[in-house]
Amino acid sequence: MRRSIRAIAAALTVALILPAVVLSAWPVADRHSYISQAFKTGHRADDIAAPGGTEVVPIKAGRVVFAGWKRNCGGYQVWVAHGNGLYSAYYHLRSESVSKGQNVKRSQTRLGRVGHSGCAKGTHVHLEVWRGFPWGSKSYRVDPWKYINSGTWLPYRYR
């Protein structure tokens, strides 16, 4: 009896952890892109440098909850809800290619293109991952690296 309870507990733990880690992907469609500034105190995101105009894709499937311009220094941005209180936000885009309410597929749907809108210095995507709706009173940002599965190549320099 004890073994079966432990087996069930282990299976539930795996079921809760794996979707967040395994089902995500590198958000910039360029093999020469890299993390130019990592998640740390004072910078609660990963900045991914890439040539202007490079496609930006979601790290995970979900539904767009915001797409457009905001005056928060993020410029053109897209926010995606992935379920279970997980959101990803992509800032400094050249423009957005999706609209609010649209379903997006991991690595397949173009959210926009890399740009330097808002207060950006140089072309990059500022990627944030949130637990809770972005900028909500009980929400907080988590390290995006924990949700990116970059495959067999590692497009980063400062990790």
What is each PLM-predicted segment?
Residues 18-77, 81, 106, 116, ...:
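Surface-exposed, glycine-biased beta-strand/turn segments
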Residues 86-89, 140-142, 146:
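Short beta-strand segments
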Residues 124-128:
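Histidine-centered divalent-metal-coordination microenvironment in nucleic-acid enzymes
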Residues 97-98, 110, 116-123:
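Short glycine/proline-centered loop/turn elements that form peptide/ligand docking sites
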Residues 49-51, 57-58, 67, 84-108, ...:
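Short histidine-centered loop motifs in beta-beta connectors
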